[in-house]
Design a protein with these regions (language model features):
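Phosphate-bearing ligand-interacting subdomains
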Residues: 36-89
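Glycine-rich adenosine-cofactor-binding loop
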Residues: 2-20
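Structural signal for interior beta-strand "rungs" in well-ordered beta-sheet cores
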Residues: 83-168
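NAD(P)-binding Rossmann-fold cofactor-contacting core
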Residues: 23-39
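Short amphipathic alpha-helical segments
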Residues: 17-19, 68-72, 114
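Residues at the starts of beta-strands that form the adenosine-phosphate
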Residues: 3, 27-29, 55, 79-80
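Flexible, charged surface loops at secondary-structure boundaries
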Residues: 1, 24-25, 49-53
């Protein structure tokens, strides 16, 4: 079993912890945060926790901040997982490059490419042939219809419907 260190103990961090716990891959989950009593330490001290049996996950809702932390962790060779809730559906013909969270009830259909640091939130649907560039957040219940190419760090607000090929 492994340990998971989540950077950020806010709402998204709590969600990541909940989903990670449900995957059964971790026997210990802890937080680093600069302003939370739930944290064992501050984010900048993450280097003190690097080990072969520890994964890190930057759980910041700010897309640019999350992607920045991902690059920082990767440069130091930290292990950063993709976390997929057991009730989410990700087509076996979809490619998730790395370090993405797919939350409960989300659907990612066939032929999609999901790049690093994306959040596909509860009940969101990403239909066939879409590409999500790094840091994209598809919020609660949003629908991204087929063959869209969403730009880096785009936020698709809750309940939004993006029509077929609206973003090329």
């Amino acid at each position: 079993m492994r340990k998971l260190i989540i950077l950020g103990a806010g709402g998204y961090g709590q969600t990541v912890a909940d989903v990670a716990e449900q995957t059964g891959k971790y026997d210990e989950i802890a937080f680093l945060d600069d302003n939370s009593d739930k944290a064992i330490d501050t984010c900048n001290n993450f280097v003190n926790y690097i080990s072969d049996d520890t994964d890190f996950y930057p759980a910041f809702g700010n897309n640019e901040g999350r992607v920045g932390w991902l690059h920082r962790l990767m440069e130091l060779g930290c292990s950063i997982p993709t976390i997929i809730h057991p009730t989410a559906y990700v087509s076996p013909k979809t490619t998730i490059i790395a370090v993405t969270t797919v939350l409960p009830g989300a659907i990612v259909n066939t032929g999609c490419v999901v790049k690093m640091g994306c959040i596909i939130n509860c009940g969101a649907i990403v239909d066939h042939g879409c590409t999500l560039e790094e840091g994209v957040h598809v919020c609660l219940g949003a629908i991204v219809k087929g063959e869209n190419h969403l730009p880096r760090c785009m936020k698709v607000e809750a309940g939004t419907v993006i029509n077929n090929r609206e973003y090329q």
